[in-house]
């Protein structure tokens, strides 16, 4: 928003005769540094999808609003929510309202708005830790017999130890990655 030819915040008080220009926020919306997000308790599915895509995404299903603001500020994360009241908190460093009720609509909104770099299959969907490739021998004691027989390629979270492989569920996940990649192009 411009008033009198200079950028002003929405709270700016106009003087008589001021001319106001309002421009849309550019897309993708510029952020300081690589996008890092913190999602509120109502966006758990979106959080898992962002992690699947390799986007640095913090999420806790039991964190109250003041704690979310503190974490977002301390870690310089964009707080994503559908709670407009949360976004109005003065102490919040940076936040964004996520549009849509379906997780696919929410994901598309976020990808089109912020265009984070996608690195699919590199983050743990449970804790956001970084995945690393591991040998079957390293994780064999953790696997059920059918999994050991059927799969040879594995990844493991360096933070929580969760083991990943391209199992029967991977078709659905690959479709999410395919759609997200198309939306980000």
Where would I find each of the regions flagged by the language model?
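Short linker/helix segments within small regulatory modules
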Residues: 11, 141-153
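Loop/turn positions that initiate beta-strands
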Residues: 15-20
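Short functional micro-motifs and their immediate structural scaffolds
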Residues: 129-133, 165
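Extended interfacial segments that mediate partner engagement and assembly in macromolecular machines
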Residues: 25, 29-58, 166-184
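A basic, amphipathic helix-loop patch mediating RNA/tRNA/ribosome contacts
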Residues: 1-11
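Short cysteine-rich clusters marking metal-coordination/redox-active sites
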Residues: 124-127, 157-160
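Short metal-coordination and nucleic-acid-contact micro-motifs, chiefly zinc-binding Cys/His arrays
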Residues: 117-121, 150-153
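BRCT (BRCA1 C-terminal) domain core and associated BRCT-interaction motifs
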Residues: 63-75, 86-87
């Amino acid at each position: 928003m411009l008033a009198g030819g200079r950028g002003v915040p929405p709270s700016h008080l106009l003087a008589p005769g001021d001319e106001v220009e309002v421009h849309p926020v550019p897309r993708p919306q510029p952020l300081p540094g690589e996008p890092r997000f913190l999602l509120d308790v109502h966006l758990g599915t979106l959080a898992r999808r962002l992690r699947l895509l390799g986007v640095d995404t913090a999420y806790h299903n039991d964190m109250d609003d003041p704690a979310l603001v503190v974490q977002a500020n301390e870690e310089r994360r964009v707080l994503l929510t559908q709670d407009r009241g949360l976004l109005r908190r003065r102490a919040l460093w940076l936040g964004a309202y996520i549009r849509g009720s379906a997780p696919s609509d929410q994901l598309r909104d976020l990808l089109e708005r912020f265009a984070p770099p996608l690195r699919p299959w590199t983050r743990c969907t449970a804790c956001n830790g970084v995945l690393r490739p591991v040998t079957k021998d390293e994780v064999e004691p953790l696997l059920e017999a059918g999994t050991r027989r059927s799969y040879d390629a594995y990844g493991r979270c360096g933070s929580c130890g969760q083991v990943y492989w391209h199992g029967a569920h991977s078709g659905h996940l690959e479709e999410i990655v395919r759609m997200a990649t198309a939306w980000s192009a």
